[in-house]
Amino acid sequence: MTDNEKEVMRLLSNRATVRRGFEMLVGLYSEKIYWQVRRIVITHDDANDVVQNAFLKAWLNLDEFENRSKISTWLSRIAINESLDFLRRKQRQSGINTDDEQLIENKIADEYFDGDAIESLLKDAIEQLPDVQRTVFTLRYYEDMKYSDISSIL
């Protein structure tokens, strides 16, 4: 556990400093959580919405964190579950799976998309995976998580 993580845990454990601790927690992990979510839900706007919901859920359930795992693992689990819930809702609302045309439109409109041909092929292949498999793939190969950590998150 890093010094920052220790400080966050110390602040979160005291009612008088819990708000400051959570602000520090958001500062430490928001970018990491954003990119985990972004690789699952694909678009920037959707990722921002899911991340906001994940941190809100973490704040509302802070007293349920039991300190058996790292707080970053707990946050990741919340964010990934929120991402998968978002995709399920989106799929129910559309009534069909996201088709290739929509994926291409998202990629073209994505200001962060690099455009490199190999990266494009890889991104296409990853986007075709079922939600849970895509999540496992991104956590393992983009986040370098161990399978045991991934299984505890999912």
What are these regions (language model features)?
Residues 14, 39-42, 53-70, 90-91:
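Sigma70-family region 2
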Residues 1-32, 39, 127, 154:
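N-terminal module of bacterial RNA polymerase sigma factors
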Residues 16, 116, 126-134:
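Short helix-coil-helix linker/hinge
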Residues 35, 49-56, 69-81:
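Structural recognition of an alpha-helix C-terminal capping motif at a helix-to-coil junction
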Residues 136-140:
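A short pre-motif secondary-structure segment
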Residues 64-66, 77-97:
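Arg/Lys-rich amphipathic alpha helix in sigma70-family domain 2
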Residues 2-7, 93-119:
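Internal acidic/polar
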Residues 45, 148:
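Residues within helix-turn-helix
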